[in-house]
Amino acid sequence: MSKRNQARKVGRFMTMPNDPFKYSFDRLEDVADHISDVLRCPITIEDVNHKLLAYSTHSDCTDPARTSTIIGRRVPEKVINKLWKDGTIPALLKTDQPIRVKQIDEVGLSNRVAISIWKNKQVLGFIWALEIQKTLSDEDLLTLQMAAKAVKNKLLKLQIRKTKNEERSQEFFWKMLTGHIHQEDDMADGFHKLGMAAPSEFSVMIIRINGELTEKIEQQLQYLQETTQQVYVLLATVDSNELIILTSPKTDHPFQDLKQFALSTQKQLKERYKIEDVSIAFGGIYNSISFVSRSYQEALSVLKTKERFAEETKHLFSFSELGIYQYLDVLNEKRKQAGHYNYSLSKLEQYDRDHQSNMVETLERFIEADSNVNTASKLLNIHVNTLNYRLKRISQIAEIDLKNVNQKFTIYLDIKLRHMDL
């Protein structure tokens, strides 16, 4: 039975009990304790991005997933991933009915019931009730629905406060991105006003949706950035079809952290939300916060390069991975100004035009394959002997020595610069 059908079955043919939540509580923690007292089971309350807002303290029974959530103040990422895969979270985002969640031993999750808290058509958060010492009855499930309604107003107030904080942080982030704030002391002061410490190591990442960035997609991106535990996401803002985030690594391997986060984001956008046409890039990793603007410009440069050389750079995410592509714009401008002419490349291009051949592409793939004829022949889908013959003809036509690294690299660079003008 699907999670959605379970929810329908749970909420059917039940008479609403008296409301035990008609009296208001000042603190969300008190609400969690009261729900726990009424239902006689441990309770946790989370926001829509699975950050812990409150938990009941009256019960000693728990499970490893709940313990980790309380210690880390958020649901562990491995638990979130499992709940997506088993259909629990997708179901919670579609219905306001309670949903039973079966035990998942590998992430330390015992049986529980979950319910989402709604305001109109928007999910504000979730209540989780552990079924360790008892199984919730039909009447308990109705009580849980009343609890969700009682918690709604508390979460609305938190959301309003969060929105105001986000507006302040977005304005500050934009000033750094555009260079309007560039002094390190001013930046550190800005972080302090937001209740944060300036990062000791960081990079700017851009997630570009190649299409319209709708409000729904923006919420999905925000969900991914707030639930990740691969990097720290310090600041975020949206510009047109791009989500721009200031990230800080979590381990002593910052490049690995950032690349893994980029790969994970790309994968989850595809698997969870069916969003495939997306480009992700991050700039240099710096220790001084005064380089935020530079890291941002480098991330933009990566996206520009990925557009121009889509096939060659499809597995690249970072500015440091671009290699010679970092310098193509500068070289192209310099060579245009100097009226540069590559004799060998021009000879090959003329030969291709006259004979409807592809000698330039053959040479390009050969060099990209690190001059390995076996690898290059597979890329070109031709026999090794055919490739060897072509390489011999290329040497004759272009009058170059393909064993000379300098000559090979020069003509390869000019081939790439030619692509920029197409």
UniProtKB/Swiss-Prot annotation:
The keyword DNA-binding applies. One of its GO terms (molecular function) is DNA-binding transcription factor activity. Keywords: Activator, DNA-binding, Sporulation, Transcription, Transcription regulation. Pfam families: CodY (PF06018), GGDEF_2 (PF17853), HTH_30 (PF13556). One of its GO terms (biological process) is sporulation. The keyword Protease does not apply. InterPro entries: CdaR-like_regulators, CdaR_GGDEF, GAF-like_dom_sf, PucR_C-HTH_dom, PucR_C-HTH_sf, Transc_reg_CodY_N. Disruption phenotype: Disruption of adeR causes a sporulation defect. Activates ald expression in response to alanine availability and is important for normal sporulation in B.subtilis. Belongs to the CdaR family. This is DNA-binding transcriptional activator AdeR.
